[in-house]
Structures are given as C-alpha cells and as structure tokens.
Amino acid sequence: WQPIQQLMNSGGLADIDALLQSDEALMQLNQDFAEDSWTQRAVATYRHGCPVTAALTYALYHKVADLSIEQVLYLETNVAVHCAANPDFKEGVRALLIDKDRNPKWSRSLADCLSVEGQAYIDQHFGNPYPKGEHPLGDWLGSDALGSRYVG
C-alpha cells in the first residue's frame, strides 16, 4: 500500500503516467519491489488498463481523504453506476471475456482525460445517477454532511 500511496501523492496524474509508462522506471520498480507481486501486478494493470479508470481512480483517491466511510461508499456507488454505463466497461468485457483478444480499444486516452473536457467527463461520474431521493445509500447522509456536494 505504501508504494501506491507515495506514487499517488508524488505529482499529478500526467507525472504518474509518465513514470509508470517509462521502461526505465518499470525496471527500477521491478528491482525495488521484486518480492512484492501485488505492486508489480498493479503497475502492469495500470499500463494496460483503461485511461478513464486511471483518471477516476486518481480523482477518487484525492476526493475521499476527508470523507466518512458512508460518504465514500455513497460516492463509489455513484462512480460504479456511471462506469457500468461507460462504453469502456463494455469494451473491457469484450476484450477480456467475449473475444478474449485482450486488446481493448479504449474510448479516450489519458491525455483526453486530462483535458478540460476530459476532466468534465470524469467529474460526471461522481454525480448522483439516481432520481432525487432514490439513491440506495441516500439515507446515510444529511444535506449538511461533509461531501454532501456529491449528494443530489
């Protein structure tokens, strides 16, 4: 966990991406974490994973620092519902489970996600996808709760 935490706090997502996509950095990570298969798998997954997921993970990591567990679960529910409707979810299922070619064609690059329009797209995933008053976890949070801007 500590290597991931250090990485997430080491700069912006573009900086992290440059590091994780670098072959030299990958060799260094493999040396530093030779005994840590979890970290190695996390880096490999990042390098081949969906850029929208990377941007969402980075944003979520930084949004939840001061939220309660109830607020985090509420927010993650919002993100999960939006992700299920995301074209990249379908593409990932196709590439991994249906065609099994392991060659997904993601809808956006990381550079797209970091643009103003891309950030707006990422931010949409945090909004309440349910009609007012129908969020399954809505009763957990009051309107004055920290993080209530995510409660709609």
Regions found by a protein language model. Give the residues of each.
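C-terminal alpha-helix plus adjacent terminal tail
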Residues: 1-152
